[in-house]
Amino acid sequence: MSLPAHTGRRKYLIIARVGDNSLHASWLEPKEFRNFDLCLCYYGDHPGRYGGGCDYDLKDEGSKWSAIKQIVKRLGDDLFQYEAIWCPDESLQTDAFNINRMFHIFTDQALWLAQPALSADSDCSRRETVQHPEYILRYT
């Protein structure tokens, strides 16, 4: 698995392990709000399936976190050119506007670690991970 050099086009990076039912295509719209590079590590049966919509198109075996570990190792110092990195699950339904907003809050608040809240209709086991309409940001 090799990665091309960082293009410097965008401030943020999303690294996602994706299969044939990934929802990541919604992350790229509307295009005018896309402020991130997208690195997809595909584990399905159709190599190159998502190559057109991402900046880094990889195929690798193994679990989500072992694949992300390999990507991080290969990107090396190029990771430091990004202001923030997000490693979402492929099953998250969102769009470029909300991702842009998430990254803006992250950098505006100088956070070192963060995650977006889930919508009220999400399948989750922890109540504190669900959106609360009165908050922009919560510390836990």
For each predicted feature, which ranges?
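Short, solvent-exposed loop/turn segments at secondary-structure junctions
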Residues: 21, 45-46, 92-93, 119-121
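Short, flexible loop segments at the rims of nucleotide/cofactor-binding pockets, characterized by
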Residues: 62-63, 91-93
